[in-house]
């Protein structure tokens, strides 16, 4: 049983009862604050509303979403915040309706794939069950020239065929026509086309859903929001049983660096979940990450994974092996030096072969046998 109540989280809490009434309830106040955070490049709107969200009975869930079949409601924000959202996302008055914005996700993000993926990355990792509005997985657009809220309810764009593959009926008999503009039209944006492209938004969404399914921590875990000094970065931990997930999001249009206090997880190795790439282990110092514009990471803080092979605990520069020659290259050859320097030449060659060259080889990037000692070269 799903409750649709556009109210503050503490008021919606009553609909769950003791776990014997509604199983799920929409978290309406979170939706506009996710858009506000990316517009302001500040995590505060998201963190504030999540701190106001009460615990709910075990077995119940919040339903979280980026868009739905109605307007992006702005009832749960202040009048000042509402004016800001209108100026950022609905400068065209035709996009406004009631106390909200009748646009889809892709147009709201200016069809910027990095921003769309960032929003979906937050959606899929926030506490609760994510709900994806049909068409958002392929970046469908809308039609602000259609009255009421029907501009975001156009037919699903399955293929470039007639009626976007949605219906074989006469196009004139459709209740709503499919989108036909050059950027979002069904000939350019459709499931059939994106299914054949590995880098498409559709296939990216499928991969991220598959990654999410590998850990129960996403849906059932307890969230702890971190408070790094850089407010352009949103970071939180999700813990469930022995599984710990770290989610980090860059809300800015510029690259950002962030230092995270992860000392409670010292010696664990963060493994980036999409590519299964191990990062350097967590130490006693703040953990430094850099993120490209509108980028995010999901890390599993693993206890049973080794640090990457290239990682060195001692990052100080090693002293370069040095050998001072008394007679240029002739110093290595006893046949080419004065008789009274033959002993010096032999010692010089011995030092070259057993010390200088082995140490030089071991620090070269192209040397494949890392971790093994070279006795003589």
Located regions from the model:
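Conserved NTP-binding catalytic cores of kinases and kinase-like/nucleotidyltransferase enzymes
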Residues: 312-377
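Active-site and adjacent substrate-binding regions of carbohydrate-active enzymes
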Residues: 1-312
């Amino acid at each position: 049983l799903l409750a649709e109540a556009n109210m503050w989280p503490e008021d919606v809490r009553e609909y769950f009862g003791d776990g014997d009434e509604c199983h799920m309830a929409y978290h309406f106040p979170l939706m506009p604050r996710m858009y506000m955070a990316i517009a302001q490049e500040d995590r505060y709107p998201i963190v504030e509303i999540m701190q106001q969200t009460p615990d709910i009975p075990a077995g119940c869930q919040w339903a979280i979403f980026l868009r739905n079949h109605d307007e992006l409601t702005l009832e749960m924000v202040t009048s000042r915040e509402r004016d800001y959202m209108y100026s950022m996302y609905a400068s065209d008055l035709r996009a406004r309706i009631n106390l909200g914005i009748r646009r889809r996700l892709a147009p709201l993000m200016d069809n910027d794939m990095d921003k769309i993926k960032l929003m979906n990355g937050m959606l899929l990792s926030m506490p609760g069950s994510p709900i994806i509005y049909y068409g958002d997985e392929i970046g469908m657009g809308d039609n602000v020239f259609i009255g009421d809220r029907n501009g975001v309810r156009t037919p699903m764009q399955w293929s470039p065929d007639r009626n976007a593959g949605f219906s074989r009926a006469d196009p004139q008999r459709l209740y709503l026509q499919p989108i036909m503009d050059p950027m979002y039209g069904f000939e350019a944006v459709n499931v059939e086309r994106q299914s054949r492209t590995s880098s498409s938004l559709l296939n990216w969404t499928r991969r991220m859903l598959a990654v999410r399914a590998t850990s129960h921590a996403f849906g059932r875990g307890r969230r702890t929001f971190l408070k790094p000094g850089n407010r352009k970065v949103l970071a939180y931990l999700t813990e469930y049983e022995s599984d710990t997930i770290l989610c980090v999001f860059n809300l800015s249009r510029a690259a950002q660096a962030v230092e995270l206090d992860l000392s409670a997880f010292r010696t664990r190795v963060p493994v980036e979940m999409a590519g299964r790439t191990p990062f350097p282990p967590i130490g006693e110092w703040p953990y430094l990450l850099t993120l490209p514009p509108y980028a995010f990471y999901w890390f599993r803080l693993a206890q049973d994974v080794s640090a990457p092979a290239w990682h060195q605990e001692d990052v100080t520069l090693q002293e370069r092996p040095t050998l001072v020659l008394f007679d240029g290259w002739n110093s290595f050859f006893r046949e080419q030096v004065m008789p009274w320097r033959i002993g010096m030449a032999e010692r010089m060659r011995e030092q070259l072969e057993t010390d200088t060259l082995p140490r030089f080889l071991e620090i070269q990037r192209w040397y494949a046998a890392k971790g093994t000692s070279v006795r003589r070269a």
